């Protein structure tokens, strides 16, 4: 459930929106001691959902800076997290900056209105869009020279790209995803290594956060929806591997996936079907249409398409067959302090990078 930590930040500019999303050290310590208690790992993979962060900038009241101001704020955020884990836990961080570029075509293929509200906002905000293109281009170039900081982008949900990146890792190191997107909640459920999502936000000078893991993903989703305890109790025996199917049968308004059925009825349908052994209490592929038809016999085709649009496993399979996945140009780790210093002087004179703590 949500935890609170007092603090202050009120976004006024694009870069201040990034700064406002830094998780302070007191809160990081609380999260780390709770989520990774007893871990002997010496490396932590940190995934930062830039798309979810940057979408907050497409508002008329946000002032924009220069072509590197947001890039500097993001890199300093990475340094902020790296310095914390190095100083207090002796743990090295590999940091992945995940960004969705353009429309999410593989989601739209099955649900044409997918994420159209966010896309329209970006298309109408020409000045902010140009500003962000400049900043992300500089950020992408800079990451090549920063030790173990990577910039990955593509026309896919960041949760899909994160899930795929975790699948490719072979060292069993734990993963922490920093994002306010509920779609990320499915990643810990299917990850082979310990993975958590930190969903945090500032509300009236307080930081509120929830820690999502492979066991509580559905419970935390319903808590985020601010549903009653009685409704939440209905999901306690439902395997979180049904997360994607549950979302397809309900809603995700941030991606314009509008209501198919209400939450309480959906949970009743799930529990009934599981208890009668009509469906397994485990992951069901969207390809199993006969089984899915038992949940919505009059709207099976619509449900299957919605499910294909939001299901993490299905979308990850599509991503891993794409040219975006095959393109490994992001996987560059030149570790060139002189080049970092040169780029800092060239692009970040007004917004310097804290290079001494990299």
State the predicted function of each range.
Residues 10-173, 190-203:
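Noncatalytic, basic helical substrate-engagement surface that gates or grips nucleic-acid strands
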Residues 177-179:
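Conserved RecA-like ASCE P-loop NTPase motor core of nucleic-acid helicases/translocases
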Residues 185-186:
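Hydrophobic, aromatic-enriched interface-forming segments
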């Amino acid at each position: 459930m949500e935890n609170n930590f007092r603090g202050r930040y009120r976004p006024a500019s694009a870069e201040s929106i990034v700064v406002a999303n830094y998780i302070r050290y007191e809160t990081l310590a609380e999260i780390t001691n709770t989520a990774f208690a007893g871990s002997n790992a010496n490396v932590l993979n940190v995934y930062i959902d830039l798309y979810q962060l940057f979408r907050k900038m497409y508002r008329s009241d946000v002032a924009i800076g220069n072509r590197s101001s947001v890039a500097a704020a993001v890199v300093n955020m990475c340094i902020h997290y790296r310095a914390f884990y190095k100083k207090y836990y002796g743990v090295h961080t590999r940091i992945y900056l995940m960004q969705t570029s353009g429309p999410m075509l593989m989601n739209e293929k099955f649900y044409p209105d997918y994420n159209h509200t966010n896309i329209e906002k970006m298309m109408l905000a020409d000045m902010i869009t140009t500003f962000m293109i400049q900043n992300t281009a500089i950020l992408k170039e800079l990451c090549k020279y920063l030790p173990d900081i990577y910039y990955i982008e593509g026309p896919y949900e960041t949760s899909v790209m994160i899930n795929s990146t975790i699948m490719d890792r072979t060292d069993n190191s734990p993963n922490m995803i920093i994002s306010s997107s509920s779609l990320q909640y499915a990643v810990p459920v299917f990850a082979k290594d310990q993975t958590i999502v930190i969903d945090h936000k500032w509300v009236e000078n307080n930081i509120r956060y929830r820690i999502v893991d492979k066991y509580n993903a559905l419970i935390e989703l319903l808590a985020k929806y601010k549903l009653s305890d009685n409704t939440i109790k209905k999901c306690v025996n439902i395997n979180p591997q049904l997360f994607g199917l549950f979302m397809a049968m309900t809603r995700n308004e941030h991606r314009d996936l509008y209501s198919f059925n209400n939450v309480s009825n959906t949970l009743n349908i799930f529990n009934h079907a599981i208890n009668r052994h009509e469906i397994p209490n485990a992951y069901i592929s969207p390809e199993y249409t006969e089984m899915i038809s038992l949940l919505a016999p009059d709207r099976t085709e619509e449900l299957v398409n919605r499910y294909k649009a939001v299901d993490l496993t299905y979308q990850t399979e599509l991503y891993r067959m794409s040219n975006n996945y095959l393109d490994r140009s992001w996987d560059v780790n030149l570790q060139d302090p002189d080049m970092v210093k040169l780029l800092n002087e060239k692009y970040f004179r007004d917004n310097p990078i804290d290079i001494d703590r990299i």
